[in-house]
């Protein structure tokens, strides 16, 4: 059976297949660059694992308090060495990226301190953590003030107003690397380093925290290499590569990580407790494979950008821009387009492919959201997934794919659904 016939069995028409193949053939040089980045990052991870003498004993389970968990302690040192930080928390008790960010914020801020976002509004779920949207237990309720400096119209930092916003009470600056549910560009590690240097020149003792979700292993360096005091991420995104069943990490300066640990558990216990309950093997294996899986997700994102840009849709990043994370935003312009795209992604999944996603009132968001994720791990966005808020400009955010081939199928399937509903013409 030839490849085209196999795709036909999966519901891909000849026209969609041919269109996709033409696009794929034009991307060989771009894909080779991703291969080189992945190889570099793979060697970084292997070196850190060998340096810390990872052994079979590290895969054992701990229970109860989790004292002296060799696997947990070694894994945290592997992360710290890979990311070039003094310390790192890597815990299954951290439920998601938002939780990791909240732990870091509450652990390092005190009543009367000010939190500054110099990159505009943070991700929707962080609004209630901070208190931008009123919520019980927010930072605002605990007396932490929040300031925000929006980006300039071209998506760059407003240095003039950032300088005005930083004052003697500014304790922590939070920088979201990825675009979130926005159509602004995601930031490069170099840009983040320049922003951190600018802020620290004004106030050297300010803590700079980077939300690194969706950004790990996209480049050969991380925000921790350019001055970030804290770097936060989720294990059901890039560093877990679809194998980690749960978890998050907080890496950075030893004092900042320790402060976060007292919020994760409690004062006096900090990093010393936290049973791993048998997940260590998956956390290690996920981190080991993460550079390769991230590479496949990047190829899928670039493929999506090229497909939809050729059809006239605004895409961020565009088809030729450098990649700073694995997310591809496509502005579809209509609710019908957003729904069709997500339903196509779902139909390409190995799990729950028969399910039809519909918009729903998702906790933490101010509008209905549609999500497609036929994943092995619930909510895993390093696996093939797409989502978007049901409000103008009806942009979809596509990411993931444990293999490039699966990401490719997902994009072709999304296009097929839009063609079938007469939302696009090839």
Protein language model regions, located:
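Flexible linker/loop signature enriched in Pro/Ser/Thr and Pro/Gly
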Residues: 62, 82-85
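Structural motif
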Residues: 86-89, 113-116, 171-172, 205-208, ...
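Conserved C-terminal alpha-helix-loop-beta "cap" of PLP-dependent enzymes
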Residues: 309-426
